[in-house]
């Protein structure tokens, strides 16, 4: 599944991944279903979309949304997009018409970045850490942060999203002791 694996569930904490082996198709199949890719390649027939073009576009999209870790320390997306029941999503949509959600087989996946932004955390800092000003889902270290700082911010964001929406955010990075 997208951004998930057995190492985040049944084998969590049992292994440290030090290498991988890939089996690649000789005939590429480009998946451009992600919104910005779909829009960018909409004018082309599917068989004219090359892996190199998709790669270049993915890099451009990521650079426009995410801070460069070499410039501003971060771990990328810090919270998973929560999945709620269809009923809960409909209830939230009545109160928050701009709610961003995507139907899934198991319910509705909500955009955690949108929830965090609406809870007032986009671009906001708590000491040396904060949520990125361009992408509210990304927790950044402005310099000198400790794990205590990171966890305090994560807890505050989680609390505020829960209080505003009644939705729990799950941390995505796995922390090592």
Where are these regions (language model features)?
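Phosphate/pyrophosphate- and phosphate-bearing ligand-binding catalytic cores of soluble enzymes
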Residues: 1-140, 144-148, 164, 168-177
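Conserved ATP-binding N-box helix of the HATPase_c
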Residues: 161
